Amino acid sequence: TSDDENRNGQCRHGVVHLLPSRAMRADALAQYMLKKRWQKWFLVVGQTQEDQLFAAAIKRAAKRFNLKIVAEKNWTNDFDARRTAQADVPVFTQGEDYDVLVVADEQGLFGEYFDYRTWSPRPVIGTQGLIATAWHPSHEQWGAVQLQNRFKDQAGRWMQEVDYGAYLAVRAIGEASVRSKSNQVPVIRDYLFSS
């Protein structure tokens, strides 16, 4: 899960988190934006609770890396026959001076409409555009090409992040079994949680 609470106050004993949380994803984006010197952010937030949580992670990362959110707007539009992304997005994003547009839309309800449609041509990051993810099909190091090709041959599609998480879980258990020289659950569990 991406929920930060599951790694903090609600963290359970005996749980191993394999995929990045919202805070980790936001920090990764902030670090890259800092490297590119894109320090002024325009934040667009959706209406769902998940969007609010991702926006909070983005704000935390911006503060942590000394980046500035110069504008924040809530997206309340829906696209129907009378309204189009071509018309709404440029108007929504004009009037602000920013380096990058940050979208918080975890369910993908509107974020895809922002790429190449902003008033000023700016990169889009966050939950759409440039995203922080544990896995991407273009990853080529550490045997990733072979893993990707084998997965595609068996599943008939490219590996996604959730698939990679499942692979990591199986790989961790297998590695613990080999290194502990045991197939007993308590021994494997103890190995996984040892320092």
Question: What positions do the PLM features span?
Answer:
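Extracytosolic ligand-binding ectodomains
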Residues: 1-195
